[in-house]
Amino acid sequence: PSAGEVELAGHALGELDEDRRARVRAEHVGFVFQSFQLLDSLTALENVMLPLELAGRADARQQASALLERVGLGQRLSHYPRQLSGGEQQRVAIARAFAAEPDILFADEPTGNLDSQTGARICELLFALNRERGTTLVLVTHDAGLAARCQQQLRLEGGRRVAAAG
């Protein structure tokens, strides 16, 4: 931005060095990517455990297992991403994103690579976890129906805001 400040959890991000910004992101921000971004060499359980272990959580295995159970993958803990369907991979990514209990979660086209039925289930899961955990959800989508479910919407065209609702 050319003016103003960005604050997250009481931290003025522009005043922090890169290491401190990375720490704030790790402690307060979660991401769900359209392309899942799972580590191929790790199982579903290990992918979800990773941010918990990096945060020094002694209960990483239990928390990751519980989250995978919550997203319906309790029987797929030891499966690698290549052994999972697109919808299953996205559910692992969602579990990983919520693992560290972020204050804010950015979801970039979370249903973009999924068929409509799987996409609808993923949306239900995202909104359910959002409500249960009190996480602020910032959702980027081209799906007008999905956007309509959000409390607030911003519409961009050519990189500029053209409308706001909610």
Which residues are covered by each model-predicted region?
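ABC family nucleotide-binding domain
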Residues: P1-L156
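H-loop (His-switch) and adjacent beta-strand-loop-beta switch element
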Residues: Q153-A165
